[in-house]
């Protein structure tokens, strides 16, 4: 049986999302197992946060106490233990955690994979198993193998989207046994801004009412209050595209309807994820808090859909 991100019967629209506790986070994703919530985000060994209610958060350590040895083969210049931009999915009884190994501003990168039977460290079966590399890029490639996101199409077939700058957002079909690229799978470019520096990254694809929605981040993160990150979205009837924005502009030609570009306090929102529970949905992302000198901070907000099926945030 396929599960995307199990949230049970939680009604996200009835919750108060005034988050509290340890909220430092960059590139967050969420999962829920039983009554407990988990956030995974960029940091030493992939950082983990946990919550009993989705609102009050505390740090819970990391996935990898030390980095897998194989990464040096792909990213020899990396000399610190920060792993980037995880994504997690639950498939056939196993949690699959994808993550990025790279150095800033280069496309010498690799996406790795770890698995676990449970997210609860109190469970005797709790153990993150290194499953090695998934896909990599080199300086001679026109894409950047970071920012992974796994999506299942309407037939239950898993796909991996990823990408940052270079030629933009990529998509490749996964093998259902290994959850790595299928033999002879074709690498597809599904979104590009069409001009240098092609500041698009962090894809996240969800399916709703017959449409695939591609959420991406435009412009520049990681500059604190000088960040220009913003969240954009397009949609397609086919997982491979073409994705178009609300005005019908192709995301292969710079299209993308802006969902959130921040405000005076919350600067540069981006690297988002979207989750459903019944008819309700949430948007999970980081933004830079101007009241805390640009500290990257976890945000979780209700995500609504208009009569034409386009997502929006409440004012």
Swiss-Prot record:
Enzyme class, spelled out: hydrolase
Induction: Transcription is repressed by glucose and by the binding of AraR to the operon promoter. L-arabinose acts as an inducer by inhibiting the binding of AraR to the DNA, thus allowing expression of the gene.
GO biological process, one term: arabinan catabolic process
MF terms (GO), sorted A to Z: arabinan endo-1,5-alpha-L-arabinosidase activity; metal ion binding
Pathway given in the UniProt record: Glycan metabolism; L-arabinan degradation
Catalytic activity line of the entry: Endohydrolysis of (1->5)-alpha-arabinofuranosidic linkages in (1->5)-arabinans
Note accompanying the cofactor annotation: Binds 1 Ca(2+) ion per subunit.
Keywords from the named record: Calcium, Carbohydrate metabolism, Cytoplasm, Glycosidase, Hydrolase, Metal-binding
Chain sites annotated for binding substrate: 27, 105, 144-147, 164-166
Record localization: Cytoplasm
Function according to Swiss-Prot or TrEMBL: Involved in the degradation of arabinan and is a key enzyme in the complete degradation of the plant cell wall. Catalyzes the internal cleavage of alpha-(1->5)-L-arabinofuranosyl residues of debranched arabinan, linear arabinan and short arabino-oligosaccharides (degree of polymerization from 2 to 8). It exhibits marginal activity toward sugar beet arabinan.
EC number(s) recorded for this UniProt protein: 3.2.1.99
Site entry: Important for substrate recognition: 271
Gene field: abnB
Residues annotated to bind Ca(2+): 271
Site residues (Important for catalytic activity, responsible for pKa modulation of the active site Glu and correct orientation of both the proton donor and substrate), renumbered to this chain: 147
Protein name: Intracellular endo-alpha-(1->5)-L-arabinanase
Family stated for the protein in its record: Belongs to the glycosyl hydrolase 43 family.
Catalytic residue list: 27, 201
Cofactor (UniProt): Ca(2+)
Quaternary assembly: Monomer.
Source organism of the structure: Geobacillus stearothermophilus
Pfam families listed in its UniProt record: Glyco_hydro_43 (PF04616)
Highest taxon listed in the record's lineage: Bacteria
GO annotations of cellular component type: cytoplasm
């Amino acid at each position: 049986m396929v599960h995307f991100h199990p949230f049970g019967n939680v009604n996200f629209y009835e919750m108060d999302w005034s988050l509290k506790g340890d909220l430092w986070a960059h590139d967050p994703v969420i999962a829920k197992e039983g009554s407990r919530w988990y956030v995974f985000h960029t940091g030493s060994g992939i950082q983990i946060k946990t919550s009993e209610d989705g609102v009050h958060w505390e740090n819970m350590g990391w996935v990898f106490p030390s980095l897998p040895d194989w990464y040096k083969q792909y990213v020899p210049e990396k000399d610190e233990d920060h792993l980037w931009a995880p994504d997690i999915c639950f498939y056939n009884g196993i949690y699959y955690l994808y993550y990025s190994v790279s150095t800033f501003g280069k496309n010498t990168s690799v996406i790795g994979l770890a698995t676990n039977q449970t997210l609860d460290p109190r469970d005797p079966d709790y153990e993150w198993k290194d499953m090695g590399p998934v896909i990599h890029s080199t300086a001679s490639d026109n894409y950047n193998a970071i920012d992974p996101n796994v999506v299942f199409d309407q037939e239950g077939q898993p796909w991996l989207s990823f990408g940052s700058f270079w030629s933009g957002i990529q998509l490749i079909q996964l093998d259902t046994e290994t959850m790595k690229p299928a033999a002879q799978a074709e690498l597809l470019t599904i979104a590009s801004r069409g001009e240098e520096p092609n500041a698009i990254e962090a894809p996240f694809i969800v399916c709703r009412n017959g449409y695939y929605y591609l959420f991406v981040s435009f412009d520049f993160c990681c500059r604190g209050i000088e960040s220009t990150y913003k969240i954009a979205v397009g949609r397609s009837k086919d997982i491979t595209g073409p994705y178009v924005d609300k005005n019908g502009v192709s995301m292969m030609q710079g299209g993308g309807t802006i969902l959130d570009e921040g405000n005076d306090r919350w600067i540069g929102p981006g690297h988002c994820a979207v989750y459903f529970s019944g008819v309700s949905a949430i948007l999970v992302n980081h933004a830079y808090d101007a009241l805390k000198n640009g500290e990257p901070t976890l945000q979780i907000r209700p995500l609504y859909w208009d009569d034409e099926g386009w997502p929006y945030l409440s004012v």
